[in-house]
Amino acid sequence: YHNFFEHYGLSATRGFGIQLLTGKSIGGGTSINWQTSLETPTEVLNEWDQLTKQQDYFNSDVFKESIKHVVDNLGVTTEYNHIPLKEEKLAEGFEKNNISYRVIPKNNRSTHGMECGFCAFGCGYESRNSSYKIWLENGNFNGNIYSDTGIQKIIINNDKATHIEVENNGTASRIEVERVILAGGSLNTPRILLNSGYKNPQLGKNLKTHPVSGVAAKFNEQQQPWYGSMQGMHSEDFLFKTNNYGYLLQGLPMHPSIFFPYFPNFVSSAEDFIESYNHWSGAIVLTSDTS
């Protein structure tokens, strides 16, 4: 957790209203994820065009070709995925309620290691097509990468970035730079800019999240909630209920170290949960909030 996740996987909003499971490894969400790789729906692209007044930029051939380039290079496919044992009850429930579902596309290159079930902690089988493996290992990157190094602030002199202050394994240093491209994500980019002295009142105030709720149940049959494909299938039947807003239903891997922090109501019955762990299965409901 200390190597791959922000704040050991326990990042949260002020007041702990929403917990944020965010990665920090090289390769980003293509390296530390559940391998679920979904293209942005046309309905959302239409909404982005409307909100940004970009005159069909997000629906343009150029943008769609860029998405296709990424998808193709990451090898996103359903070929190496299937519904694992832990999601069979969910699929059964969908069928009984006439809810359609489909196998989730993933960015893995083969079935090797697919049943491991620990993809969220890094792939020990090198079977994941992360951006690190695709673009960096193939010689498409000309430069140096410094892992375990966090940028604290940018030093500005005469309206120009001249240095960055970084910390590596507890050691702080200042590095001279010619230019800076800041790509710290929606959580860290505002923080770095604020630390650097930027005064824009909008910095850090417009983050939108898509809240996730979870359900879990204990069954008589063994479920192996830690094993197999991290996520095998999902349902989009309720994704666009009203004006593009609704919810997405997906299976849930239930490793205790991930499960307990995000399902605090189970803590009081932790002993029973651990003793009967092999008989539990769960699902998540991803709410579509403002884009």
Question: Regions from the language model: what does each represent?
Answer:
Residues 200-291:
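FAD cofactor-binding and catalytic pocket of flavoenzymes
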